């Protein structure tokens, strides 16, 4: 929906405004491979793919795993994409 697109655009803009490019550092776990965790409930999460240099969806089982899982693609991008 157009409301969802506007929200996404707003979040991306906020992320870019809050963290100056020159001082941004990638989240320490962005280079780790995706780890689905080991609990029973499965939800959609996003991880940073270092080979493709983008955030991708994967099924996260809700606990454990590593830090390379984010609730939204926007959060993944904010934490893991660093622009030169």
Curated annotation (Swiss-Prot):
The keyword Secreted applies. One of its GO terms (molecular function) is toxin activity. It comes from Bungarus candidus (Malayan krait). Beta-2 bungarotoxin is a presynaptic neurotoxin of the venom. The B chain is homologous to venom basic protease inhibitors but has no protease inhibitor activity and is non-toxic. Residues 30-80 form the BPTI/Kunitz inhibitor domain. This is Kunitz-type serine protease inhibitor homolog beta-bungarotoxin B4 chain. Disulfide bonds join 30-80, 39-63, 55-76. PROSITE patterns: BPTI_KUNITZ_1, BPTI_KUNITZ_2.
């Amino acid at each position: 929906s157009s409301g969802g697109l506007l929200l996404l655009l707003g979040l991306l803009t906020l992320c870019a405004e809050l963290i100056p490019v020159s001082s941004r550092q990638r989240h320490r776990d962005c280079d780790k491979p995706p780890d689905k965790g080991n609990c029973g409930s499965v939800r959609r999460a996003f991880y940073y793919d270092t080979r493709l240099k983008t955030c991708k969806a994967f099924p996260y089982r809700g606990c454990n795993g590593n830090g390379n899982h984010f609730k939204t693609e926007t959060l993944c991008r904010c934490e893991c994409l660093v622009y030169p």
